[in-house]
């Protein structure tokens, strides 16, 4: 599977889809891509991990950094479609104390 990011703007929200690995090999590229994507709207952002095969600690750091970026504009970040293993890792990292998990993105 190719490692890439795609996004859609649905109504007032931005949905970002991560494909392949979310690991240290791709974080620099993804960080700059995400900054541009997040600037395209004012509403909530959903990170959809349904096509993500692997997430390491740098991937969690990337998510946390984008959360902080959105907080400056009083915007919310939601996480969606995590695998059971990834869900557990995000839970142990305390991510759900900062952002909400949703089973799927509606809209």
Per-range role (PLM):
Residues 14, 106-107:
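A short acidic, often aromatic-flanked loop/helix-cap motif at beta-alpha or helix-coil junctions
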Residues 1-17:
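Short beta-strand/loop segment at the start of cytosolic alpha/beta domains
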Residues 22-98:
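Amphipathic alpha-helical interaction surfaces in cytosolic regulatory modules
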Residues 100-104:
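Short acidic-hydrophobic, aromatic-tinged amphipathic segments that line or gate anion-handling sites
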């Amino acid at each position: 599977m190719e490692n890439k990011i795609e996004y859609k703007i649905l109504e007032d929200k931005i949905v970002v889809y991560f494909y392949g690995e979310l690991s240290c090999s791709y974080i620099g590229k993804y960080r700059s891509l995400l900054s541009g994507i997040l600037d395209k709207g004012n509403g909530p952002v959903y990170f959809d991990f349904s096509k993500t095969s692997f997430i390491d600690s740098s991937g969690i750091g990337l998510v946390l950094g984008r959360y902080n970026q959105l907080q400056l504009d009083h915007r919310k970040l939601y996480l969606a479609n995590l695998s059971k293993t990834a869900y557990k890792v995000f839970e142990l990292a305390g991510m759900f104390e900062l952002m909400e998990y949703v089973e799927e993105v509606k809209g």
